Amino acid sequence: GVDKEGCRYLLGACTIDDDCCLHLGCNKKYGHCGWDGTF
């Protein structure tokens, strides 16, 4: 994920990892942001 204005939080809709905020990645199966395992 990225640290930028407008990034999606946990369970926010996404198509790619960079749609999501830091420490979140896009879950392609469900189409939302989830924790990517980083701190």
Curated annotation (Swiss-Prot):
Keywords: Amidation, Disulfide bond, Ion channel impairing toxin, Knottin, Neurotoxin, Secreted, Toxin, Voltage-gated sodium channel impairing toxin. The keyword Signal does not apply. It comes from Augacephalus ezendami (Mozambique baboon spider). One of its GO terms (cellular component) is extracellular region. This is Mu-theraphotoxin-Ae1a. GO terms for molecular function: ion channel inhibitor activity; sodium channel regulator activity; toxin activity. Expressed by the venom gland. The presence of a 'disulfide through disulfide knot' structurally defines this protein as a knottin. It is found in: Secreted. The modification Phenylalanine amide is found at residue 39.
